Amino acid sequence: EGALLAGDTETGVSIMLLDKEMDHGPILAQEKITISETETAPELLVRLIKLGSERWTAILPDYICGKSGATPQDHEKATYTKKITKADGEINLADDPVEIYKKYRAYSGWPGIYYFLENRTRIAIKKARFEHDAFVIERIVPEGKKEMDYVDYKKNALD
């Protein structure tokens, strides 16, 4: 989520040994991948899990036999992210469309993104895209209702 939220174009996996500190141990392997412009967190997670398991399977035999070792981590280059909460998914449709789309991509799994109408009805955004410098909502779930097309919702709201 952090890479998508930051607008990064690449991310990757690190296979590390554990020590007493969080994300601190020596590194056995690292590999980067490119993030597509439309990829969401759940889609990216599938690719990262596959990549991580492939790298782990490839390095494990040599590590067990002592043919390869771990490299100390450069803690100056380490990156950290914050804990995500449900409140992080709230958006304001008046905000920068680029930033809203980053949130959509990062939080499309959990917590999802949503906004509130003036009457405090929560609208969860299930599908969206970025097109012509605009955040375009395609599918929503209004609080207490079933998923629907955003165009139909807006049309019915105006009737």
Cite the ranges covered by each PLM segment.
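Generic secretory/membrane-interface signal
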Residues: 1-2, 82, 143-146
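Donor/substrate-binding cores of folate-linked one-carbon enzymes
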Residues: 1-80
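A short catalytic or substrate-binding loop motif that flags glycine-/basic-rich loops and adjacent residues
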Residues: 7-9, 83-85, 106-109
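PAPS-dependent sulfotransferase catalytic core
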Residues: 76-91
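An anion-binding loop in the catalytic cleft
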Residues: 88-159
